[in-house]
Amino acid sequence: SYMKKGQAIVDANHKAIDAGATAFHKFEVPADWATAEDKPHELSIEGHAAIVEQVKNLLEPINRMDGDSLPVSAFEKHVDGQWELGASQYEKRGVAVMVPHWDETKCIQCNQCSYVCPHATIRPIALTADEAAAAPENMRMIDAKGKGTDGLKFAIAVSPLDCMGCYNCVTACPKDALTMVPQEDELDQAPVWDYAVNKVSEKKELVAANVKGSQFAKPLLEFSGSCAGCAETSYARLITQVCGDRMFISNATGCSSIWGNPAATS
């Protein structure tokens, strides 16, 4: 099949194979690494007491691959299969190589980026004057547009450590206000995200049953275990914003069993 592209492409592939066999670099591993031990680390998190307990006692050990060391008693509170919701916000996996950077000078505040995000890692934020004044210095804001936004500031918050790097938001943006950049370039936005989701109030007066208005509602499905770019969790997340917490989702098993209820990472 490569021959359809020409002999030069075939030769380039052959050269790449040959280079791979000789271009490696030997790395000497220090002998003391064999007995190296991790320094004790006290996990410091805030939130609902039951979720914090679940994260500390189960989520963290399991994610460290220490699940086999957990006693049966650690699961006693979950013997009926129930887990506290919202634990996934504490994972902060940081798996995306590239994450979106928001250019406020191009943004038209359509909220389509948030609308298509499968993992709820990019969100529009409306801030009062007091909330804007207390925001981190590097939080970029513009005057909010639209009905009922007088006196409000607008921002797009991105969680660089929760983003999966799927490019959906960049593709959806009609004005090229989002560009993908290396994750490390956006790590300074993590405190901005924390402030936006934890300290800024939900503006219920802006919530409406349309693309823009729906994204001012807090998503009740976030940071799930679905694949990067998953359309299924985009729909499910949107339903939670439209219907709220008085709802059940009943469907056939499949991917939803995986992203919907991975043990300890609810």
Model feature map: region roles:
Residues Y2-C163, V170-S266:
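Ferredoxin-type iron-sulfur electron-transfer modules and their immediate structural context
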